[in-house]
Amino acid sequence: NFLSDSKEANRKLAAKSVGKVLGDNIKIFSSITNTLAKDKSINDDWRKLPNPVSARNLSNVVEDSIVDSLVNSVVDSYPKLSHRYFTLKAKWFNKKHLMYWDRNAPLPFQSSKTFTWKEARDIVIEAYSEFNSDIGIIIKKFFDEKWIHSPVLDGKSPGAFAASTVSSVHPFILVNFQGKARDVATLAHELGHGVHQYLAGKNQTHFNASTPLTLAETASVFGEMLTF
């Protein structure tokens, strides 16, 4: 990801390249965006949903008011958190203001240590095992049974996913491992989903094994916290 490259020239080139493609196709992308927005509006009207976010909140089994409170709290914290952080980051880069392509730049003092797949595996298994040995056994099973696909390949979707199938079949983990500390944390995150899905499949039926996003992310973020 050149937008996270340590060299500013590479980050700038990547940002300008993305911007150029978007600019060259602005009418197409505008048409797509407007079409999707109108389709969403029509569906919401048919279903008598009060807000654009209501459909998503309904699927996540959470009230609009709860999400609104969360969003407002985050926005209220901008000055003392994100604004302060980016001001500090600009100073660390000896700049008055950060450019767009500096947002995801690694910090000057950030460790460049990389991890092998085996090292990442051992770190994650140990982290979960120290919390609970039974969960550690399940995590190890994901590696031993090859339920994880980790290489970066042409045509493979970016990002990371825990893909459940049916309750009688184990889930699969899809990551793009490149050896960074963030990749180890991502592996731990997705395995949190994986353990959750594995245990749900063992103890629930096909119709109630799935969970809303609000609950699912609790397990995955907890896995990250165990690891780092």
Where are these predicted regions, by residue range?
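Cation-handling catalytic/transport regions enriched in His/Asp/Glu
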Residues: 1-228
